[in-house]
Amino acid sequence: TYNPTGSSTGIQAAIDGTCDIGLSSRALKDEEKATLTETIVALDGIAIIVNPANPVSDLSVEQIAQIYTGEITNWKDVGGDDLEISRIGREAGSGTRDGFETITDTKEACKYNQELTSTGDVITTVAGNPNAIGYASLSAVKDSVKALTVGGVAPSEETVLDGTYTIQRPFVLATRTGEALSEAAQAFFDFATSADANEIIAAAGAVPVAK
């Protein structure tokens, strides 16, 4: 059975032995690697999104960090209109938020105007607010928002896989090191890490890594 409780909860369940495989949308931390083995099955770009009415089309990672930490507060400072920036993000414990804050080096420093509990809510909020900036899994981005290029690189399957789009995170299977999985769990693990799963992973919008 699959229980979607968030990355940190899934990792802790794997550590505690209350599940066979913990699923995470962030890399394991060093202390978690003390008891768990990390297997990357896919990559996901985290798109930086704005309202389609926003004339800004590109930001650097540094500018994104400065916006989210409150150092830059007006769109005019990055080539946009004279409007106060509304910073939209995910709730604490979200793998997307963890990935975004890790890559932009803004952990514990982000000043969010709104912290929302789902990617869909972030997209809807940004779509309805011309001042807003948000982040969302590339696979979830809709035409109702505009995904920015980051350092001149557009988020796509190709740029995520070749590493030129830098705001990306891994999807991880976390298993207890040195412990055998049950027959059913091992069968799932073998399938998920094989090229046979690539079509399913791609259909879900992530970038498969198995050859």
Language model: regions and residue ranges:
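Exported/periplasmic ABC-transporter solute-binding proteins
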Residues: 1-211
